[in-house]
């Protein structure tokens, strides 16, 4: 994939919304997170944690955000896996990201 250092999956798929075997182009943010749900069809929920600075208290607070992402057929993922998702065009009302890599050994 151009611009993102991820390896090509071994499995082949015929999903038109696959960034590897379909016609979906990725651009914008690349986010790492943990899969919290994979119950929906071809959709995963990824949770990421980040720190937000609070001026009044001069300290950081920990925040979480949940992002829905498209899961192509060529990538296998389960709850608890560490993944990398990339921004793409809007695929549904809530999906703007697509799964591009499953981290090994985590």
Swiss-Prot record:
It holds the Pfam family Ribosomal_S17. Keywords: Ribonucleoprotein, Ribosomal protein, RNA-binding, rRNA-binding. The keyword Signal does not apply. It comes from the Archaea. GO terms for cellular component: cytosolic small ribosomal subunit. GO terms for molecular function: rRNA binding; structural constituent of ribosome. GO terms for biological process: translation. CDD domains: Ribosomal_uS17. InterPro entries: NA-bd_OB-fold, Ribosomal_uS17, Ribosomal_uS17_arc/euk, Ribosomal_uS17_archaeal. Disulfide bonds: none annotated. Part of the 30S ribosomal subunit. Belongs to the universal ribosomal protein uS17 family. One of the primary rRNA binding proteins, it binds specifically to the 5'-end of 16S ribosomal RNA. This is Small ribosomal subunit protein uS17. The gene is rps17.
């Amino acid at each position: 994939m151009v611009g993102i250092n991820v390896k090509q999956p071994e499995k082949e798929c015929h999903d038109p919304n696959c960034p590897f075997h379909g016609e979906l182009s990725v651009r914008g943010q690349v986010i790492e997170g943990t899969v919290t749900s994979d119950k929906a069809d071809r959709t995963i929920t990824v949770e990421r944690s980040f720190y937000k600075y609070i001026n009044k208290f001069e300290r950081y607070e920990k925040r979480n955000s949940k992002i829905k992402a498209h899961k192509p057929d060529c990538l296998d993922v389960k709850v608890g896996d560490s993944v990398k998702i990339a921004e793409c065009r809007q695929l549904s009302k809530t999906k703007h990201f697509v799964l591009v890599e499953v981290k090994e050994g985590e």
